[in-house]
Amino acid sequence: MTTRTRRESVSFARPFRINGVDRELPAGAYEVITDEEMIEGLSFASFRRVATMIMVPAPRGSAMEMISIDPADLGDAQRLDADAGT
């Protein structure tokens, strides 16, 4: 099975919460990693998402933590952050 990993940066202007993370996260830029696998048997390349993770500061120290999240929850957090600025 062919897989690929996409990386993107998302930014939050204010502290935020997201399902799957047990604490409030500070404002800032976060790396989001999405793993996708190719759907076999099609006449064109098509991928489906199999995992989405966000890199967040660990509760203590300078380490980073990778946490699995639902992409819909990430979208909700981004909308709330954008709406809070209006």
Regions found by a protein language model. Give the residues of each.
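Short, surface-exposed beta-strand/turn modules with glycine/proline-rich turns
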Residues: 1-7
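A short tyrosine-centered beta-strand micro-motif
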Residues: 28-32
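Acidic, low-complexity intrinsically disordered segments
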Residues: 56-86
